[in-house]
């Protein structure tokens, strides 16, 4: 599992979802480099250096004997897209944590709200929703939900997300949470607005399981 910035809560959430789908059998290796997201936030885009370090983590995972790689940071998800040929060549799939979540959002409605606390996550997530919508021969309207809550404690974070969701609720059919670290607010937001709310860890774990099944594992 490749993280560019993380918290113990996110690791616990992702591991829990993986075990729900795969049981306790898999050995989970965590690779972390917080400097990647810090550099992306500082520049406002994925720099060449940040992309190189991320791909370096993919290659380290391959060298360490990984059977599949889960990319957990949506801010650098497009690097994972660019690395798909590496996955095919090495036989080690590189799975984005958020892609199947984006597909489910397109299935659920034409108006998709995207909640994020970082502009560098908001735009790549919107790009992914637009791409998968084209692939599904669908069209979506995207509604921004940028919240200034990065670094807030859990209660404050949840309250700010709920307030933003309520603000855009009439404009959307479904809301997706652009960052995996937002997953713990999913139920609270759903209760507040009464519309589908999607977070990436469970979809990423399902995609991981599917990738392993396709390898015959």
Which functions belong to the PLM regions below?
Residues 1-217:
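Non-catalytic structural scaffold of enzyme domains
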């Amino acid at each position: 599992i490749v993280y560019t910035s993380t918290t113990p809560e996110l690791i616990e959430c992702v591991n829990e979802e993986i075990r729900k789908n795969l049981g306790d059998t898999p050995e989970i290796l965590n690779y972390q480099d917080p400097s990647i997201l810090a550099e992306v936030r500082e520049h406002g885009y994925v720099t060449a250096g940040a992309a190189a370090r991320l791909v370096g983590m993919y290659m380290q995972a391959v060298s360490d004997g990984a059977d599949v790689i889960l990319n957990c940071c949506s801010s650098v998800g497009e690097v994972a897209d660019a690395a798909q040929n590496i996955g095919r060549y090495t036989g080690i799939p590189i799975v984005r944590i958020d892609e199947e979540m984006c597909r489910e959002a397109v299935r659920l409605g034409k108006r998709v709200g995207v909640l994020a606390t970082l502009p560098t996550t908001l735009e790549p997530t919107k790009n992914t929703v637009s791409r998968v919508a084209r692939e599904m021969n669908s069209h979506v309207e995207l509604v921004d939900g940028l919240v200034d809550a990065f670094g807030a404690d859990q209660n404050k974070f949840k309250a700010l997300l709920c307030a933003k969701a309520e603000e855009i609720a009439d404009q959307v059919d479904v809301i997706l949470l652009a960052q995996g670290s937002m997953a713990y607010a999913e139920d609270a937001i759903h209760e507040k607005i009464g519309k589908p709310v999607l977070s990436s860890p469970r979809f990423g774990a399902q995609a991981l399981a599917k990738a392993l099944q396709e390898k015959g594992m």
